[in-house]
């Protein structure tokens, strides 16, 4: 699991993000903090995770589908190996629900 070098900063970010969502300000908050390229990268990472969780798509095919590097796919794959299976099932459920709507 990701361990920040400064957990106080990370925890402050998480709490502020939580508050932003509660108050309906998540778009503005994340737009303030992330450049357009960073927002694209987060979206790409979610697509990578979704396809990796599908388990029917080989990594090389994911790389070609998303026009990204093998290293990017590998980083996503390595993070999946470190995460709790119940959490990954929840993520898959969320991503699948978004895909259906």
UniProtKB/Swiss-Prot annotation:
It comes from the Bacteria. It is found in: Cytoplasm. This is Trp operon repressor homolog. Residues 59-82 bind DNA. Keywords: Cytoplasm, DNA-binding, Repressor, Transcription, Transcription regulation. Its main location: cytoplasm. The gene is trpR. Belongs to the TrpR family. GO terms for molecular function: DNA-binding transcription factor activity; sequence-specific DNA binding.
């Amino acid at each position: 699991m990701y361990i920040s070098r400064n957990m106080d900063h990370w925890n402050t970010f998480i709490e502020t993000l939580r508050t932003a969502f509660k108050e309906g300000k998540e778009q503005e908050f994340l737009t303030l903090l992330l450049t357009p390229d960073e927002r694209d990268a987060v979206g790409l990472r979610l697509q990578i995770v979704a396809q990796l969780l599908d388990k029917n798509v080989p990594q090389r095919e994911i790389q070609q589908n998303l026009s990204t590097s093998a290293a990017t796919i590998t980083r996503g794959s390595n993070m999946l190996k470190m995460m709790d299976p119940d959490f990954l099932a929840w993520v898959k459920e969320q991503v699948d629900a978004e895909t259906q709507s």
